[in-house]
From Swiss-Prot:
Cysteine pairings via disulfide bonds: none
Protein known as: Minor capsid protein p49
Family: Belongs to the asfivirus p49 structural protein family.
Gene Ontology, cellular component aspect: virion component
Annotated region described as Disordered, given as residue ranges: 134-167
This protein's record includes keyword Lipid biosynthesis: no
Subcellular location: Virion
Alphabetically ordered keywords of this record: Late protein, Virion
Domain of life: Viruses
Native source organism of the sequence: African swine fever virus (isolate Warthog/Namibia/Wart80/1980) (ASFV)
Induction entry: Expressed in the late phase of the viral replicative cycle.
Length: 438
């Protein structure tokens, strides 16, 4: 049912598989195991079967393919800790992005989160082996430069105009996992103690947020496992934590962009693509623009508790620097918009109750956040079973039935939406619309 709906809606995308999907080896495609797990009845994930002719995993051919999801966004539902590709109630049509606004040959797909943070990092990492990269050198110059270019920022085509020399942080801005560390040809040693923000010269902040603070911010959107969140609740990530890679903010920005539906500002085209240097560093202004876009999405779609925002020590000072890029954030914060739990109604309705607040850190059991353990659920596509999330985060309830002819605009409002309030002891206001001038 879900596959038929997606196929009809995105038939034109199926005929044009992106270069990224065709070039990436199957054994590095974590999401294939998710697909096989959901559509082959093997909850541990079946081994992908590569089909040379259809460029799709054979065992999952009747399930949703990654190319089906190119133009979907996933709701920021705080109660969903572990959403896979197959949960159709989490699929929503997302407004198409003009191709001249994206780095055309990079796929923007939302990763399927698991309970293991290492998997979160590994499956969003760009591998360093030469053969695993798209042939960017073969793209036309016009495609290489199809990047969102705000007029207020320095030219991205000429790194010399950037406020920070592009070579200064070259050793800090590669995507990698621990397995790839020995393979990197970097200048100098990468140390956990090196925060990009601390490396900047001058009396003013050039745009980077130290990765520890970005990690805190983006974890609010990701809702990472409690084993990592309990460290965040302690006002900081211990630098010796193996989950925290030196370039965690870059990797989290990449995965958060796909998770929130915020278009990621594509990286600059590589000068050294023959060595697999697919990604070059972001300029400082470019980095800040991406973070502000993500923050905008998080604030606009999440229930935010001010005491958690206050746990991020640098955020208050950084909102001022976001002002030229994202007036919404600056204005919202200045008017104390975040003093209460505020939920903005998204553009598209969803069956899932998106009004639930993020987990209350005070409600913990041995340092663990109150999450619904999806590993105890048996997912079956034969009886159209949709898990009911009954634990921890508010009183979120999902309908157990799903219309065959799904249309996001026809989904009835949940009781929380109708009442414009949250159930339980969490008070909030639901705003049905918001002026862009906020």
């Amino acid at each position: 049912m879900y596959h038929d709906y997606a196929s009809k809606l995105l038939a034109d995308y199926r005929s044009d598989p992106p270069l990224w999907e065709s070039d990436l080896p199957r054994h590095n495609r974590y999401s294939d195991n998710i697909l096989n797990s959901r559509y082959c009845g093997n909850k541990n994930g079946a081994a992908p079967v590569y089909n040379e002719y259809t460029n799709s995993p054979g065992k999952a051919e009747k399930g949703l393919q990654l190319s089906d999801l190119r133009n979907f966004s996933f709701m920021l539902n705080p109660q969903h800790k572990n959403i896979g590709y197959g949960d159709a109630q989490d699929l929503e049509p997302y407004s198409s992005i003009p191709k001249n606004k994206l780095f055309n040959h990079f796929k923007n797909y939302r990763p399927a989160f698991s309970t293991h943070t290492e998997n979160l990092i590994k499956r969003n990492v760009v591998r360093t082996e030469k053969k695993t990269f798209p042939q960017v050198s073969g793209l036309k110059d016009t495609q290489k430069n199809c990047l969102t270019q705000p007029s207020s920022l320095p030219s991205l085509k000429n790194p010399k105009n950037s406020s920070v020399p592009s070579t200064r942080f070259s050793e800090h801005t590669k995507f990698f996992s621990y397995e790839d560390l020995p393979k990197l040809r970097t200048k100098g040693t990468i140390k956990h103690e090196q925060h990009l923000g601390d490396q900047m010269p001058g009396q003013y902040y050039n745009g980077y947020i130290p990765h520890q603070d970005v990690y805190n911010i983006l974890c609010l959107a990701h809702k990472l496992p409690a084993s990592v969140e309990k460290e965040i609740a302690g006002r900081g990530i211990p630098l010796g934590n193996p989950h925290v890679k030196p370039n965690i903010e870059q990797e989290l920005i990449k995965s958060t962009s796909t998770y929130t539906g915020v278009p990621m500002l594509g990286p600059l085209p590589p000068k050294d693509s023959q060595h697999g240097r697919e990604y070059q560093e972001f300029s400082a202004n470019r980095h800040m623009l991406q973070v502000s876009n993500i923050l905008h999405s998080v604030f606009a779609n999440h229930s935010i508790k001010p005491q958690i925002l206050e746990d991020i020590p640098v955020l208050n000072a950084q909102l001022a620097s976001i002002k030229p890029v994202s007036p919404f954030l600056n204005k919202a914060y200045q008017t104390h918009y975040m003093e209460n739990i505020v939920t903005l109604v998204p553009r598209f309705k969803s069956i899932a109750n998106y009004s639930s607040p993020i987990p209350n850190y005070s409600k913990r059991n041995n340092g663990q956040a109150e999450y619904f353990d999806t590993s105890k659920q048996t997912i079956s596509r034969h009886n159209n079973y949709i898990p009911k999330y009954t634990g921890g985060i508010g009183d979120s309830r999902l309908d157990s039935t799903f219309p065959k002819d799904f249309n996001a605009s026809s989904v009835p409002l949940t009781s929380a939406e109708k009442d414009h309030s949250l159930r339980g002891d969490n008070s909030a206001c639901c705003i049905s619309s918001i002026s862009p001038s906020l």
